[in-house]
Amino acid sequence: MSCLPEPTVLTQLWVDNPPRYSQAQLQDYLKVIKLPQRFLNSAVLKDSSLAHTKEHGLPLLKAITRYHACNVPFENLELHYSAHKTITLDPVELFEKIVTRRRGGRCMENNTFLGTVFRSFGYEVRDCGGRVARAMSPYPDVRKNQAYTYDGWNHMLNLVYLEDEWYVVDVGMGSMGPNLPFPLRHGFETMSIAPRKIRLQRRPIAESHASNPTKGTELWCYDVCLKPTKDGTEVWIPTYAFTETEFLPQDYEVMSWFTSTNPRSFFTRYVTCTKMIQDEEKEEIIGNLTLFKDTIRETIGNQRKVVRECKTEEERIQALVEIFDVNLTDEEKNGLPEERRLA
């Protein structure tokens, strides 16, 4: 029998009092992501009703998404360095973590927070769920033998409505994510981080009990092509699939619990941290910096190089400060279990 007291309230969406950030909080956030003055002059910031328009709402949506990806890391440090090893998806606590403490988070943290930011600016936002493709698995045997399959529901993204169509907004897939808003259209294809291309298709996934795979339930499938060609021989990598169904906080509570506690989860096994790199003059993302376990790599276009190899835990903590602007507290530095520490 559990010795915990019975809960008096369970997770839900508080429809009568939905989470929003104050104007002062939003201004603090825009400083954290270093949004340039030309975007701070957006008419949306003076009249929130304009957030629904493509003329005013879309440019600001693109800018905030890009600057967020380049200044708020995709990281799982809480699961390794914190004393509690737990994740919160409460928007109030996420503001404290991301804006006050200058940290980041995984998909559900980053996209819950950013969705709340956009709603606070007046945007119409729907939270959705996805399945990450096993072609993205960090485990070689899984990539080799199960690349055509998908995980269970373990990813979060946002849909933002502008005038007459939805736009996909996702800052929670690290270096393989779109990191730019794009329309929810079957067959849509665009360059994301040159020369990389992304596409969106509505199709059944391979796993289905349907007698004919083509009769399976269709999902929106987001794919990435790392090396586009002109002869039609492009290789598209399944990245994740998602549905337009609205997911609620209690859905993400279940999803986050699994991905943050399961010993087979990528997040519980490896320390990782990613920030995107942008060319501010061209207003586009050109690459990323990623820490994976003990190595930091910089990728610009299709060129990748090792920036730093960390031999000790002290070196990894210092690299988080110098390269990712992430400062762990003394408690966090001592929170990593001995068996996970670098020698």
UniProtKB/Swiss-Prot annotation:
Q: What happens when the gene is disrupted?
A: Significantly reduced growth on medium amended with BOA or 6-methoxy-2-benzoxazolinone (MBOA) and no growth on 2-aminophenol (2-AP). Leads to the accumulation of 2-amino-3H-phenoxazin-3-one (2-APO), a compound resulting from spontaneous oxidation of 2-AP, when grown on BOA-amended medium. Results also in reduced virulence.
MF terms in GO: arylamine N-acetyltransferase activity
Annotated Pfam families:
Acetyltransf_2
Q: In which pathway does it act?
A: Xenobiotic degradation
Q: Give the EC number.
A: 2.3.1.-
Catalytic residues (positions) = 107 (acyl-thioester intermediate), 155 (proton acceptor), 170
- Key word Kinase present in the record? no
Keyword flag Transferase: yes
Q: Which family does it belong to?
A: Belongs to the arylamine N-acetyltransferase family.
Q: Which InterPro entries match?
A: Arylamine_N-AcTrfase, Arylamine_NAT_domain_sf, Papain-like_cys_pep_sf
Q: What does this protein do?
A: N-malonyltransferase; part of the Fusarium detoxification of benzoxazolinone cluster involved in the degradation of benzoxazolinones produced by the host plant. Maize, wheat, and rye produce the 2 benzoxazinone phytoanticipins 2,4-dihy-droxy-7-methoxy-1,4-benzoxazin-3-one (DIMBOA) and 2,4-dihydroxy-1,4-benzoxazin-3-one (DIBOA) that, due to their inherent instability once released, spontaneously degrade to the more stable corresponding benzoxazolinones, 6-methoxy-2-benzoxazolinone (MBOA) and 2-benzoxazolinone (BOA), respectively.
User: What name does UniProt use for this protein?
Assistant: N-malonyltransferase FDB2
Q: Which UniProt keywords are given for this protein, alphabetically ordered?
A: Acyltransferase, Transferase
What up-regulates or down-regulates this gene? Answer: Expression is induced in response to 2-benzoxasolinone (BOA) exposure. Expression is also induced in response to 6-methoxy-2-benzoxazolinone (MBOA) and 2-aminophenol (2-AP) treatment.
* PANTHER family found in the cross-reference section: ARYLAMINE N-ACETYLTRANSFERASE 4-RELATED, N-HYDROXYARYLAMINE O-ACETYLTRANSFERASE
Disulfide bond entries: none
